[in-house]
Amino acid sequence: MRSDVIKKGLERAPHRSLLKALGITDDEMRRPFIGIVSSWNEIIPGHVHLDKVVEAVKAGVRMAGGVPFVFPTIGICDGIAMDHRGMKFSLPSRELIADSIEIVASGFPFDGLVFVPNCDKITPGMMMAMGRLNIPSVLISGGPMLAGRYNGRDIDLITVFEAVGGYKVGKVDEETLKAIEDLACPGAGSCAGLFTANTMNSLAEALGIAPRGNGTVPAVHAKRLRMAKEAGMLVVELVKRDVKPRDIVTLDSFMNAVMVDLATGGSTNTVLHLKAIAESFGIDFDIKLFDELSRKIPHICNISPVGPYHIQDLDDAGGIYAVMKRLQENGLLKEDAMTIYLRKIGDLVREAKILNEDVIRPFDNPYHKEGGLGILFGNLAPEGAVAKLSGVPEKMMHHVGPAVVFEDGEEATKAILSGKIKKGDVVVIRYEGPKGGPGMREMLSPTSAIVGMGLAEDVALITDGRFSGGSHGAVIGHVSPEAAEGGPIGIVKDGDLIEIDFEKRTLNLLISDEEFERRMKEFTPLVKEVDSDYLRRYAFFVQSASKGAIFRKP
């Protein structure tokens, strides 16, 4: 066993002595040591209950004959970090999470690992660490929050963000806003729509590294604890058989994950995260795969923020394995991909049942004929940009409008809420990329303001920053190269016409080639003052969003 290096032989007596200080017995020294990394804390709603999930994992490890050891990592709630300096640290925390786990699991040679995340950057950060370490592993998340209820309808956090915009234009009164605020988030779990956290936890199932139901079983359901026990038992079996993450996760696994992402209409952030995770697994993954598959995979799940359903509805309908059954029915699922169950995913999916034909529609009756995400290219995005196609209003699928340029998200939000943005405008927010922000902040407030102000059918937004999984509308993010790296988004001027064609996947600045070249030659990127040692280091090492915003290798 990997842990024998600290357990076996006379020369390891000091190591055993320290382990015995923890209460470890001689009998336990002969068993697999299982590390359990948890992002439990008391400030994130999605993490506040992870201590209970961890206890269930520990029970499962012991049931299977292993010895559990819990260690922590950090976490940030993007919702609470929104609209202030804290959002600059959200994406950078992903790298720190992966690094910290790699350090602990290398310093202590565990035989296996169980990863217990829940929210936006924590799940991908842990998945990156899993790929790097390549120790027998299972991921079990904390699960989604239940939707809130107001005035007879389901609501969630995005309802609150959009109600703020509604209040600004007199569509929502203060009493209603307060009621929505009080009821939208009823308890523990990752926010209830198909936002980044729930998308990533769902894709962990499709990758084969998490138990069935990982992405959809509500946080407060007892089934979540039973799944956690199962995760603890599974990892011990993987240790005994010496099955490692790279034995399970292949390019076919990533293709399954992308197809699930497109079919469900997942978060745009998945493009960024899957690229980074693939890199950690040593897999060559081109983001163009999203666009190639999007032409074949229809959008069949209408889940918030683009539809009325929530994750609990998807769970009731059969969950992610039922979505994969639709792929299987149409001959698209990569059935030979392996799973932590030591069974092929195709065999497991055959056992799944689709329990609601509207929540998980058949391919011949989709919500949209193409998948939920698209990659756009053009003179404004030579390396690509990302859009949530399932959230684009029909009349905005092709749009030409004048640019209104902002150098950060706050100024854009103020302008939108103060009525300075008019129908037809294209809001351009730049210097919000991985290096330029630094930190590639989410632009949830400006997009929610556009929706709340009643402009979603008439205004587009493009940025080198990111979007929350809760953003929707004619919005395009991850524009690469970013402005801080000399990208063309940096040369856009107020009033310039921008053409967006979501069907053709193009994004272009409508100026002459000569004017374009002149501006690019004269362009000197703005350099922002950065008041954080960590963010200065992050900005120095981070690569383009088109490369997953991972660090450059020395």
UniProtKB/Swiss-Prot annotation:
- Where do the catalytic residues lie? S468 (proton acceptor)
Instruction: Provide the binding site for Mg(2+).
Output: D78, D120, K121, E442
- Which superkingdom heads the taxonomic lineage of this protein's source? Bacteria
Cofactor detail note: Binds 1 [2Fe-2S] cluster per subunit. This cluster acts as a Lewis acid cofactor.
- Pathway per the UniProt entry: Amino-acid biosynthesis; L-isoleucine biosynthesis; L-isoleucine from 2-oxobutanoate: step 3/4; Amino-acid biosynthesis; L-valine biosynthesis; L-valine from pyruvate: step 3/4
The kind of enzyme this is, by top-level EC class, is lyase
* Key word Iron-sulfur present: yes
Task: Tell me the Gene Ontology biological-process terms attached to this UniProt entry.
Answer: isoleucine biosynthetic process; L-valine biosynthetic process
Cellular component, GO annotation: cytosol
Which cofactors does this gene product need?
Answer: [2Fe-2S] cluster; Mg(2+)
Function as written in the Swiss-Prot or TrEMBL entry: Functions in the biosynthesis of branched-chain amino acids. Catalyzes the dehydration of (2R,3R)-2,3-dihydroxy-3-methylpentanoate (2,3-dihydroxy-3-methylvalerate) into 2-oxo-3-methylpentanoate (2-oxo-3-methylvalerate) and of (2R)-2,3-dihydroxy-3-methylbutanoate (2,3-dihydroxyisovalerate) into 2-oxo-3-methylbutanoate (2-oxoisovalerate), the penultimate precursor to L-isoleucine and L-valine, respectively.
PANTHER family in the cross-refs: D-XYLONATE DEHYDRATASE, D-XYLONATE DEHYDRATASE YAGF-RELATED
Q: How does it assemble?
A: Homodimer.
Protein family:
Belongs to the IlvD/Edd family.
The name on file for this protein is Dihydroxy-acid dehydratase
